């Protein structure tokens, strides 16, 4: 587990490896790091240029390279990162060592804090997934035609219940979570995360599901002694410039009792998102991969497609919470 801490005159990297703890000091002031992070994020979203590689290498050299020897000595293959607020807007998977991405060598996951992390393997229960999506244009939002395909594909893999378009109403969502102790809730719809509760929502067919709605409904499942294992938010995006936005709805889900959440830092093509998500579920279904490794495999598969090789497509997916 890695705790990067940005201080006014330096960056401290705290690394926990079982019972062993190590600390590395990098002479990068907080203001410099913040500028590099912002530059990296801005370039990473530009799909027609590879200029992101320069800041990706700079950040790798500061955040990962100091601990490479320790990680190799302990045969580490998964990095669980508790990001300082300065680092919450970037995907660590897209850091670059000059030869390849961090994603090529490590699975990654984000822990908002150790208190919100429940490191137990996924408790798979066939047929207990609730898969919801909005593919039509509603409430002024553009249509997401590939969402229908994504919802069908996920439902075929996981089983459970499927609610598409007008079936996915706010009342139906609440009723379903009260009716069935679902293992997985998958929502493919427009949405936005933000520090401001008014900017944080997922779009149902007849209105917005707010943070309060989501927290209340997920907590009801927890009261039935069946905590939600995994919440997936596909086709959503974060509020621009908000360093806590990436943890928005996902963080609420964890506080409400969900063990893991998968969300994106920025909006990407619903077709690309659908392909990655389906590969992620297939990895989970294999029974041999952790959630972090299932995401890593899905990111690798998407990056291998020439249409989606740029990290703007595969990097924004973050696994938050339980990585096993």
Predicted features by range, described:
Residues 1-7, 11-16, 21, 110-113, ...:
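Preference for extracellular/luminal or secreted protein segments
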Residues 1-105, 117, 126:
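Domain-scale, conserved, charged regions that form catalytic cores
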Residues 5, 82-85, 132-136, 187-190, ...:
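Active-site-proximal beta-strand/loop segments in catalytic clefts of secreted hydrolases
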Residues 13, 79-81, 90, 132, ...:
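Residue-level detector of buried hydrophobic side-chain packing
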Residues 18-19, 36, 74-75, 82-184, ...:
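Catalytic-core domains of enzymes
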Residues 76, 273-324:
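An often Trp-containing, charged/polar helix-loop segment at the C-terminal end
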Residues 112-115, 119, 183-279:
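Catalytic cores of nucleophile-dependent amide-cleaving enzymes
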